[in-house]
A protein has these predicted regions:
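Charge-biased, low-complexity intrinsically disordered regions
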Residues: 1-32, 36-116
Length: 116
């Protein structure tokens, strides 16, 4: 629940404050944002599975973002579009986590509905 509240708070802050990111940083920011979203979806999944740990979430949130942006920067300096691989990996993980979240919610709903 903390992850969802944090995500909503971040979205509201992003809408209220007009933050312009220079175009040259957009590949790094996009990969970092995907990494953060991956951590948020992972936290929601862990929370529904009753295995959420705040320290794991926070370290993964910032660690994934920094690592993804650093790899995108390194790839840019080497002339290799590494950020595309990061987008594919994080995108796949986000969809996997979403599928698991969906199943967990449906299973909880069914168990409450039928009183299991």
């Amino acid at each position: 629940m903390i992850a969802i509240i944090g995500l909503l708070f971040g979205i509201i802050l992003g809408v209220v404050f007009d933050v312009n990111i220079p175009e040259r940083f957009s590949p790094y920011m996009s990969v970092a944002i995907l990494a953060c979203l991956d951590s948020v979806f992972g936290a929601v999944r862990a929370n529904l599975s009753k295995s959420f740990q705040a320290d794991i979430f926070i370290s993964g949130f910032f660690g994934n973002a920094v690592l993804a942006a650093a790899l995108a920067y390194l790839g840019d300096k080497l002339g290799i579009p590494i950020y595309i691989a990061a987008v594919i990996v994080f995108g796949g993980r986000i969809f996997d986590n979403f599928a698991i979240i969906r199943r967990l919610i449906i299973e909880k709903y069914k168990s409450r509905q039928w009183g299991d």
